[in-house]
């Protein structure tokens, strides 16, 4: 993802070609025809100065969304045995309507391994996810605090400037804020409001 003046980029092309992954980095897209482009070699002159950084910024914003989708989907699988737990009916949580449908003790690491082998959601990120789950199925050692390095924010700002809706990318960034406790005040305020209008006492979390 390169930005710069045409003649400068052309002069540096041998360098870019040398460090790029090359055509063997991935099979050729079946619907492409004609001679190959530099994109098929793994590099591309995207436009004037700044264009390469802009493309990389959006690439990383998309990465946030993909990572969030994997995490959320695998969490649904992880919780698929919730019907086996004793269900408490109270004002805090609506009862599980059909607990018999949620009796699955699923092997999430094995499912991730399965999906990375020819599934429509296969990707390098899923390869890494499967590796992480193989190393630590319960993800011990991870507290769930997720940093953001800036590209997600910049992508969303660009989308706002362009008038382009990016709800998935926005939600994935906000989830990272939540993971760091940035929603704690709002959550406490919600709990306080429930107590004010309905007298709902906050339930103490198990193990607290």
Residue map of PLM features:
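Short beta-strand-to-turn element immediately C-terminal to the catalytic PLP-Schiff-base lysine
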Residues: 1-5
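NAD(P)-dependent Rossmann-like dehydrogenase/reductase catalytic/cofactor-binding core
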Residues: 10, 17, 23-56, 67-208
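Gly/Ser/Thr-rich loops at beta-strand to alpha-helix junctions
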Residues: 63
